[in-house]
Amino acid sequence: MPSELRFDGRVAVVTGAGRGIGRAYALLLAARGAHVVVNDLGSSTGGEGADAGPAAAVVEEITAAGGSAIPDTNDIAGVAGADALVGAALDRWGRIDALVNNAGIVRFAGLPDADAENLDAHLDVHVNGTFNTIRAAWPHFAERGYGRVVNTTSSGVLGLPVNLGYATAKGGIIGMTRSLATAGEPLGIRVNAIAPAASTRMGARKKGDDPEMDPALVAPMAAFLAHESCPVNGEVYTAGAGRFAKLFLATTPGHVQGAPTIEDVEAHWAQINDETGYTVPADLIDWSGEHLSHLDGS
């Protein structure tokens, strides 16, 4: 039997940890020995209002079980809130080792109903909030030569017509994750993402409706990505209902032709789309080398 993966002495910050999936993350990390900052603004699923109760309740659960945690209600959509959140970890324990960006909102709408306000609301929390917390924690990770970041994307990036703003924001998380991973690798910082699936209030389904979709079944993947033994960087994993899998971007071999015409594209459409022999680029440089390899005869 493998040895238990522990977080003793580590400090983890979890955003959106007052309910649902974030709560499951915080409880598991604390149970494995981490000091946890339980961040939650306490807003509605659409981002309205604030309530200190959810974060405080999770902290009570953790401490009652013998764990170590403090509540935090800063709004990470703003720079000041994200700075204060990271500052709370530093003030209490003098360090930050792992950051789990789980906070999010959902306002269902697709075109023609979705407007710029809807899009901006999703970007503010999902994209700006994730960026703000990472930016606040990054210097501390770099100084110690160690850091783990777990961002939250969604299977919605595969196509979610009823919530365009949400899917758009979650797509941005993938680009952010992969870019930060390349920057963090030489610094000892690993940045990955999780696409969770569980019954929560955000999905308009409460825990208990589907026992197999319990948020606790997602948490092991997030915890592993936040652990020092995590071997990957810049990757995305789906998690839910007890199933874990890798979600990745790939490119087909395609068709090579000098000075092509529109008609050439049509004529070779099947070859362009043939997924046989696809490759998975590690980053932009890797993709560029592959895409332009025909120019040097390789």
Q: What does each of the following model-derived ranges do?
A:
Residues E4-V37:
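Canonical Rossmann dinucleotide-binding motif of NAD(H)/NADP(H)-dependent dehydrogenases/reductases
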Residues A193, D210-G297:
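C-terminal helical subdomain
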Residues F7, A65-S68, A88-N101, R107, ...:
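A glycine-rich helix->loop->beta "capping" turn
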Residues V150-G172, T177-P186, A195-P211:
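Catalytic loop of short-chain dehydrogenase/reductase
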Residues I62, G110-L111, N118-D120:
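Substrate-binding pocket helix/loop in short-chain dehydrogenase/reductase
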Residues I134-R135, R178:
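A short, exposed helix-loop element centered on a Lys and neighboring polar residues
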Residues A52-A56, T73-A84, A116:
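The beta1-alpha1 cofactor-binding region of Rossmann-like NAD(H)/NADP(H)-dependent oxidoreductases
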